[in-house]
C-alpha cells in the first residue's frame, strides 16, 4: 500500500482560512490556529447580525415615523391605528422615507388617519 501524503490538502485548507482572515489584526491574519478561530467567530457574528439588521431597521423606521407623526400632532400608535382603520396599506419602510424626505405627503397621510380616528 502506497503512503498517502496530505500536504497539498492541508496547504489548501490553510490558504482558504488565511484568505478569509485577510485584513485581521496581528496573529489573527497570519497564524492558522488563531485565524481559524477568528474566522469562525466572524461567521457567528455575521449570522447573528443578518437577523439583527432586520430588527434594527424596523426600530429605526418606527422612530422616524413616530417623530414625523408627533410633528403632525399624533403619536405613532394612533397613526398606525388610523391607517389600519382607513385601510391605507403603506409599510413602515415607505412611511419612514416619506416622513424624512416628503414631509408634505406624510402630513397628508397623517391627516387621513386623523380624520378616520375623529
Swiss-Prot record:
Superkingdom classification of source: Bacteria
Annotated Gene3D superfamilies: 6.10.160.10, Ribosomal protein L20
CDD domains listed in its UniProt record: Ribosomal_L20
UniProt keyword annotations, A-Z: Ribonucleoprotein, Ribosomal protein, RNA-binding, rRNA-binding
Keyword DNA-binding: no
GO molecular function: rRNA binding; structural constituent of ribosome
Gene Ontology annotations for the cellular component aspect, listed alphabetically: ribonucleoprotein complex; ribosome
Example GO biological process: ribosomal large subunit assembly
Pfam families tied to this protein: Ribosomal_L20
NCBIfam families, per the entry: rplT_bact (TIGR01032)
Role played: Binds directly to 23S ribosomal RNA and is necessary for the in vitro assembly process of the 50S ribosomal subunit. It is not involved in the protein synthesizing functions of that subunit.
Family: Belongs to the bacterial ribosomal protein bL20 family.
Descriptive protein name: Large ribosomal subunit protein bL20
Gene name, Swiss-Prot/TrEMBL: rplT
